Regions:
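Fe-S-dependent hydro-lyases/dehydratases of central metabolism
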Residues: 1-375
Length: 375
């Protein structure tokens, strides 16, 4: 399968807890004043680490002692996502992890614990592909995530944040005082993903690429017959200096996005991240091919259990309106409580064209394929 890394700057905001000039450093070691949190199946041990200062070591545990299949809804339940600021989201990190009917992680527990590493078992980050899940760790001070394996989308979201991911043997080495070359954390990835991770995540990488501080690896595929999708990608390759590029299954490339869209559950973060990374004067190229929709939370304030979040939901709507006014993208806001339509359907009908490369924040974005677009 062709591996595509999208060239966007909308996934994460970067701020550093560690006193280093650049993250990640060339050599990775544990900070003397930070801690390691083990998410054990014995939840009382988790409580003792959070509230009683208990420190554990991987040498004294096995992978089987650790929680498997940690769901993103455990990390950031849907109600947590009504906040758009990752620093606020982090205050309710792991709010969905319950024991005997009450939260294991009280508000600010992960932030106040002084942790820089978090450790779990197999398949970390299953479930919904929400970016807020790794954000809740990142903005709690976590910079290294240890697991036996990761759910693919969650792994990509961590990578976009510049979070280093490793295994339990690497953690043993770190806890025994070893400094590990960052290449051991990044070496298993394709060349483009390595660049993103070694430059601190998607936002700083994109900024350095734009400023000419990062060179993309050459597209190495020789001239060959290509499928329709491969031709779409080859026509939009970055870093080929005007030359014709050929791609094949397994290549990792950067391709220029033609258009996209967002909805009120996610646009607030887009506006916040772009403003902080590029300044308040940032612009969106070709705004007629981008759009915002009010459809996901249209009826949320009429649902009794969401009533207490009404103010936060309105903030999400207001920030989407601010983004639209700032960028001039297409506006599909509701009028008198009536939405123009569902985002992935309206986008396909009105502005996705044949041959477009579309990126959007809705899980049904791939509907654009019905218009012979790569979405």
């Amino acid at each position: 399968m062709l591996r595509i890394v999208k060239y966007e700057s909308t996934l994460a905001r970067i701020g550093f807890w560690m006193t280093v000039d650049f993250w990640p450093p060339k050599k990775v070691s544990l900070s003397p004043n930070r801690r390691v949190l083990f998410l054990t199946k014995d939840l009382e041990l988790v409580r003792k680490q959070l509230y009683e200062g208990l420190d554990l070591r991987m040498d004294d545990l096995t992978v089987e002692d650790l929680l498997d299949d940690i769901n993103t809804d455990v990390m950031t339940p849907a109600w947590v996502c009504f906040d758009h600021d990752p620093a606020i989201i982090a205050e309710n990190a792991y709010a969905g992890l319950l024991h005997e009917g009450r939260r294991v992680f009280e508000p600010r527990a992960l932030i106040d614990g002084g942790f820089e590493v978090i450790v779990s078992g197999h398949r970390k980050g299953t479930g919904s592909s929400r970016e807020t899940a790794p954000q809740c760790e990142r903005w709690s001070g976590i910079r290294i995530v240890i697991a036996a394996s990761f759910a693919p989308i969650h792994e990509r979201n961590n990578l976009n944040l510049g979070q280093l991911m490793g295994d339990h043997q690497m953690l043993k080495r770190l806890q025994n005082g070893e400094s590990i070359p960052v290449s051991e954390f990044t070496g298993r990835y394709d060349p483009v993903s390595r660049l993103i991770l070694e430059n601190g995540g998607i936002l700083p990488f994109a900024k350095r690429l734009r400023e000419g501080e990062v060179l993309l690896p050459k597209v190495s595929s020789e001239k060959r017959p290509m499928t329709m999708i491969e031709k779409m990608i080859s026509n939009k390759l970055l870093g080929v200096n005007g030359e014709i590029g050929y791609v094949k299954p397994g290549d990792a490339v950067l391709a220029q996005v033609d258009g996209g869209y967002s909805h009120e559950f996610t646009t607030a973060q887009v506006h916040t991240f772009l403003s902080e990374e590029y300044g308040l004067e940032y612009k969106v190229p070709n705004p007629s091919k981008f759009a915002v929709f009010e459809d996901h939370l249209l009826y949320a304030t009429d649902v009794p259990r969401f009533g207490k979040f009404a103010e936060k939901i309105q903030t999400l709507r207001d920030m989407q309106n601010a983004f639209r006014a700032h960028t001039g993208v297409r506006d599909y806001s509701a009028t008198d409580g009536v939405s123009p339509g569902i985002c992935h359907q309206v986008a396909r009908e009105e502005f996705i064209d044949v041959g477009d490369f579309i990126q959007a924040t809705d899980s049904h974005t791939c509907m654009g394929g019905a218009s012979n677009a790569l979405a």
